[in-house]
Amino acid sequence: MFPSGLIERPANWVALAGFMGTGKSRIGWELSRALALHFVDTDKLITRVVGKSIPEVFAQEGEGYFRACEREVVQRVTRLDHAVISLGGGTFIHEENRRLLLSRGPVVVLWATPETVYQRTKHSDRPLLKVEDPLSRIRTLMNEREGVYRQGTIHVHSDGRPSEEIVEEVVERLWAWRDAQAAWAALPPDYDRATS
């Protein structure tokens, strides 16, 4: 990894949010390589700290315990520098997490259709999909969460696209975000922002 001062990048900290199966871990890893940043997967961090897989945590301790662990991990990762953070699918849903994440830096939300999510997750051991009709459950959860996911900074669709193309779009959108932030910060203090 390059020392952090040798590369110009659009952001030194980025989080990836979105529904399960949208590609957050894969894209996060590749984005971290493209930006020469560390990569942290919050679900993997939780399993390392707790010493159990996420399905085991859900089964043995319950979803409430898992969400408490998730909140603690969010507090930790928002203190990091030079990192790309892949969030669990439900992490951004909780207001305290969302507030911390959005105040720390850009949150890129990855999107995919329910059918794509189902195809990507149908052979996994995801606790929220242990139901009779997982596709219906995916549709319901995605509909419930859509408004919250829309609060992210940048939105990118991952359906049917190679990961390199998605990463390239994320980087381009991060540069545009950084430029917009710089332009906004350059406005004079007495500028009436309501008239823009």
From Swiss-Prot:
Compartments reported by the entry: Cytoplasm
Note accompanying the cofactor annotation: Binds 1 Mg(2+) ion per subunit.
EC code: 2.7.1.71
Alphabetical list of InterPro entries matching this protein: P-loop_NTPase, Shikimate/glucono_kinase, Shikimate_kinase/TSH1, Shikimate_kinase_CS
Keyword field: Amino-acid biosynthesis, Aromatic amino acid biosynthesis, ATP-binding, Cytoplasm, Kinase, Magnesium, Metal-binding, Nucleotide-binding, Transferase
Pathway recorded for this protein: Metabolic intermediate biosynthesis; chorismate biosynthesis; chorismate from D-erythrose 4-phosphate and phosphoenolpyruvate: step 5/7
Gene3D superfamilies: P-loop containing nucleotide triphosphate hydrolases
Catalytic activity annotation: shikimate + ATP = 3-phosphoshikimate + ADP + H(+)
UniProt-listed GO biological process terms: amino acid biosynthetic process; aromatic amino acid family biosynthetic process; chorismate biosynthetic process
Enzyme class name: transferase
Protein residues bound to Mg(2+): 25
GO cellular component, as recorded: cytosol
SUPFAM superfamilies named among the record's database cross-references: P-loop containing nucleoside triphosphate hydrolases (SSF52540)
MF-aspect GO terms: ATP binding; magnesium ion binding; shikimate kinase activity
Function summary: Catalyzes the specific phosphorylation of the 3-hydroxyl group of shikimic acid using ATP as a cosubstrate.
HAMAP family referenced in this protein's UniProt entry, alphabetically: Shikimate_kinase
Assembly behavior: Monomer.
Family the UniProt entry places it in: Belongs to the shikimate kinase family.
Protein name listed in UniProt: Shikimate kinase
Organism: Deinococcus radiodurans (strain ATCC 13939 / DSM 20539 / JCM 16871 / CCUG 27074 / LMG 4051 / NBRC 15346 / NCIMB 9279 / VKM B-1422 / R1)
